[in-house]
Structure formats: structure tokens, C-alpha cells
A protein has these predicted regions:
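"…together with the soluble PPM/PP2C metallo-phosphatase catalytic core" -> "…together
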Residues: 2-284, 340
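Membrane-proximal soluble regions of multi-pass membrane proteins
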Residues: 22-23, 29-51, 281-328
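Final/C-terminal transmembrane alpha-helix of multipass membrane proteins
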Residues: 322-343
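Cytosolic-facing loops and C-terminal tails of multi-pass membrane proteins
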Residues: 346-347
């Protein structure tokens, strides 16, 4: 019956997100158009433009499509978890606190998605493409991560160490919450960077959710697979809109929501270290940017480590199309899933 719950969650997530996509595309385009009109009035008239001015670019796809994912996942998880609890009522009173772990992971993802929503709104309403100020965004992300850690700590579900291949379990003591906090915030920033190319975050997260379902089965957390199953179904539907060239973009609300899922779900089952291989494409994206900045600052702007950063921009400069970059990142995501499964097997 648990398998039926997972199938129901993924199926509902797919159809609900697909339906919401049809509804959200015109609504978001109209919403963003309201804020684009004042900017268009301030733009120079065609008579004032130079004769060799660039031709007008086609309108960009609407953003904030991550709202479709959030609504679809909430409904699908609700139905799937209800079906699982009806099939196995002991899940509600289990000593492993299945319901607490599931709700905490879901809340954490929604909190990170809320931070992304604020940034999208700030980006749309203002003329700045950066959205929220960096310190404001990092503070909100840290607060979202702290809420998750406090809830898990109060219920005694917070992992105090990590499992290293060949070493075994290593107790981190008081440093564990600080490490998990840094992990969640860093993952959110990396996912935000990866959202610069159509389909990357959506496609890689889909592969990660499939891998996470398998890993949770290996580790004995099969009932909580309802959460990644629902998200996998929703992501499959959203790819209909987000595959390059995108008709609807995730936006920061979607990318941070997915980062919250990738970080909070392993953390809530006591295996936060699985996030490292599971989110491999995101770490590569953020890692390239971090290295580029460090080298540039160390050389006082005279040297760059890479021709361009992050990874998807570097691949773009090497002549790869958007579709090729999408498939490249999917291969990297599958490699991360394989590493995650191996880590779960040997731990």
C-alpha cells in the first residue's frame, strides 16, 4: 500500500502541476507586464535610438513558476501521506516520528521558497535584476534553516554527525548544527546561481528526487518517499514548460524551494551528508563562481581562473546549445545519484 501512496502522490503532482502551468503562464505574464509598462514608458523612443541599434528582443518567459511546484507538491504530499497512513496507521505513532520529519522537511522547503518569492517580487517591482540585497537574502535563508534545525532538535531528530566512507560515523558534537546551517544556506545560493539557464534546476532536481526515493528505501525510510515522489511527478510536469526554450521559469521561488527539498529531506532522516553528492550539479555551479571570485580578488582583478562562470555559462561559451547544456547537467545529476546510492550502501 505504501507503493500505491507513492504512485498516487507522483501522479497527482504531475497532473496538478501541468494544470496549474496552463493557468499560471497567462496570469504571471499579465502580472509582470503591469510592472514592465512603467519601465517601457521611460525607455527611449525609436526616433531617439541609433540607426544600428539592436533589434527588439522577444519577451522573456514569465518567472515565479515555482509557485506551481509548491502548490502541486503540497496537494500531492497531503493525498499521498493520507493514503500511506490509512494503509499503515502505525506511521502516525511510530517512534521514528515519520510525520514530524515529513512536515519539518516540507516546512523547510516552503520557507526557502518564501525567501525566493520575496526576491522575485523585489526583482519585478524594482529596476534591479539582483532582487534582494545579499545580506538580507542570506539572513532570511539562515533564518529558514534555523527553524528547521530547531524543530528537529526539539523532537530529538537532529543528526549529530556524519558517516564517512572507510571511517564510519563521526560525531561532530556542537559543530553539527552549524555545519547543517551552512550546508542549507550554501545549497540555496548554489541553486539560485544554477537558475540562470532554462531547465537546469528542474531537470537535475528531478533526477535527484528519483535517486532520493531509492536511497530512502535502502535506509529504511520508504514511507517518507511520498515527499520526493510527489516532487518528482511535479517536476516532470513542469519540464513541459521549463525545457529550453522555456515558456515558464522557476524563478528564485522555485529554485530555492527545490534547494530546500534537497537539503531538508536528507537532514530530516538523519543523513544530511547525502546532500553533498545528491546536489552535485548545484555544488559545481556555486563552486565555480566562488573560485572565480577568490582568484579575482586575490589577484586584484588581474586574473580569472575560468573564462566564464558558473558552469553553464562556461559550457555556453564553448559552443553548446541550451539543450546540450541541459543534457550535460542531467548526466552530472545521474552521476551524483550514483554516488549517493553507493554512499548509502557502504555506510
Amino acid at each position: 500500500m505504501i507503493r500505491f501512496a507513492l504512485i498516487a502522490a507522483s501522479t497527482l503532482g504531475f497532473f496538478l502541476t501541468a494544470a496549474l502551468g496552463n493557468l499560471m503562464v497567462p496570469l504571471l505574464r499579465a502580472f509582470q507586464g503591469r510592472w514592465d509598462e512603467p519601465k517601457a514608458r521611460q525607455a527611449p523612443s525609436p526616433k531617439q535610438e541609433a540607426p544600428d541599434a539592436e533589434p527588439e528582443r522577444p519577451p522573456q518567459a514569465p518567472t515565479m513558476g515555482g509557485l506551481c511546484l509548491m502548490v502541486g507538491v503540497l496537494a500531492a504530499v497531503g493525498v499521498g501521506w493520507t493514503a500511506a497512513c490509512v494503509a499503515q496507521p502505525e506511521l502516525l505513532g511510530a517512534e521514528s516520528l515519520f510525520s514530524v520529519r515529513l512536515l519539518t522537511a516540507l516546512l523547510g522547503a516552503l520557507l526557502f521558497g518564501g525567501v525566493g518569492l520575496l526576491e522575485d517580487l523585489a526583482r519585478i517591482r524594482s529596476r534591479s535584476v539582483l532582487g534582494l540585497r545579499r545580506h538580507t537574502r542570506l539572513g532570511l535563508e539562515a533564518a529558514a534553516g534555523a527553524v528547521v534545525l530547531v524543530l528537529l532538535g526539539v523532537k530529538g531528530c537532529l543528526a549529530a554527525g556524519i558517516t564517512l566512507p572507510g571511517v564510519g560515523y563521526v560525531d561532530l558534537g556542537i559543530a553539527a548544527p552549524l555545519l547543517w546551517e551552512g550546508l542549507l544556506v550554501a545549497l540555496a545560493e548554489c541553486a539560485r546561481i544554477a537558475d540562470g539557464m532554462d531547465g537546469i534546476v528542474c531537470g537535475t532536481s528531478f533526477a535527484a528526487m528519483l535517486g532520493l526515493m531509492g536511497v530512502m528505501t535502502l535506509l529504511g525510510w520508504f514511507p517518507l518517499g511520498v515527499l520526493p515522489a510527489a516532487l518528482a511527478g511535479s517536476l516532470m510536469a513542469f519540464l513541459l514548460w521549463n525545457f529550453p526554450p522555456a515558456k515558464l521559469r522557476l524563478g528564485s521561488v522555485g529554485s530555492l524551494f527545490l534547494a530546500g527539498m534537497l537539503g531538508c529531506v536528507p537532514l530530516c532522516i538523519g543523513w544530511a551528508d547525502l546532500t553533498l553528492p545528491l546536489a552535485l550539479p548545484f555544488w559545481l555551479e556555486g563552486g565555480m563562481v566562488a573560485l572565480q571570485i577568490l582568484v579575482c580578488k586575490a589577484s586584484r582583478g588581474r586574473r580569472q581562473l575560468f573564462r566564464s562562470a558558473p558552469l553553464h555559462r562556461w559550457l555556453e561559451l564553448r559552443g553548446q546549445s541550451a539543450e546540450q547544456i541541459f543534457y550535460t547537467f542531467c548526466v552530472i545529476a545521474l552521476l551524483g545519484v550514483a554516488l549517493t546510492v553507493q554512499l548509502a550502501k557502504i555506510s
